Amino acid sequence: MPEGPLVRKFHHLVSPFVGQQVVKTGGSSKKLQPASLQCLWLQDTQVNGKKLFLRFDPDEEMGPPGSSPPPEPPQKEAQKEGAADPKQVGEPSGQKTPDGSSQSAELVPQGEDDSEYLERDAPAGDAGRWLRVSFGLFGSVWVNEFSRAKQANKRGDWRDPSPRLVLHCGGGGFLAFYNCQMSWSSSPVVTPTCDILSEKFHRGQALEALGQAQPVCYTLLDQRYFSGLGNIIKNEALYRAGIHPLSLGSVLSASRREVLVDHVVEFSTAWLQGKFQGRPQRTQVYQREQCPAGHQVMKEAFGPQDGLQRLTWWCPQCQPQLSEEPEQRQFS
């Protein structure tokens, strides 16, 4: 699943289409029925963590003043630099996907908190005007171009990826959404205090959450406190902070938790800026065999017993496990 920086890039790609009417639709989505969007007007787009929200209206009226918040500082600064490839963006340091973008091969949940949203074929009245887009493992947005196969799939076919949704707009351009789930909702779920890339990100709330008596690698992936944070950011922030992924938050000092939050924000912001400047975000431990110091990197799946196990990379020498911390086997 694309992490916060990449989804914000998707938001940037979609934004120029706001104010245009959808004149033609396409795509393979069966739950959404792409034809239900034809003749609607794209009036707004918002982003929160790993989710993208698009507002559609049946007429050309604009939304209420202030419905779309101004760009956040990291995004605004990055936009000034300009994007190297405005058509499509991918993940750093991963394997090649069927459409040629770079992604991790690990399993990830296909959408979070789906029960909060109603899936309908079309918006009804004032309700359901916001289309919520949750991207899958190889999720992407393309502008005025379709994704093409750059390698054969497992069956040996050179079949181009099929977009879930295609929106041709009155301005002459089109958007193609790949590997995503879409559902209608009455309003966007936007909580800036939890978004790691928002200027309103609540550090105090995040620090309090990190103090829980559970491995910090679990807490970092909790979107209630670190919206937009995924497995890449988790691994890189922990390595840069010198914290073992299974360290209990309750045994870490306040200063170490502060350092960890600093690295979460710094790495995420640098990744976002790199997206707009056409620079790949280099990782130091994620999917690496050695850390920058030349030590062997360990890899294992960690997660709650009743939750998803996520692949985790760490350096035992740079991120030592303290004696008062539990053994790894208790949490793997």
UniProtKB/Swiss-Prot annotation:
Instruction: Give the start-end ranges of region Disordered.
Output: 56-121
> Residue positions of the PTM N6-acetyllysine?
50, 154
Biased region (Polar residues) positions are 94-105
**Protein activity control:** Acetylation of Lys-50 leads to loss of DNA nicking activity.
FPG-type zinc finger segments: 284-320
Q: Which reaction does it catalyse?
A: 2'-deoxyribonucleotide-(2'-deoxyribose 5'-phosphate)-2'-deoxyribonucleotide-DNA = a 3'-end 2'-deoxyribonucleotide-(2,3-dehydro-2,3-deoxyribose 5'-phosphate)-DNA + a 5'-end 5'-phospho-2'-deoxyribonucleoside-DNA + H(+)
Where's the active site on this chain?
A: 2 (schiff-base intermediate with dna), 3 (proton donor), 50 (proton donor), 310 (proton donor)
What protein name is recorded for this chain?
Endonuclease 8-like 2
Organism, scientific name? Pongo abelii (Sumatran orangutan)
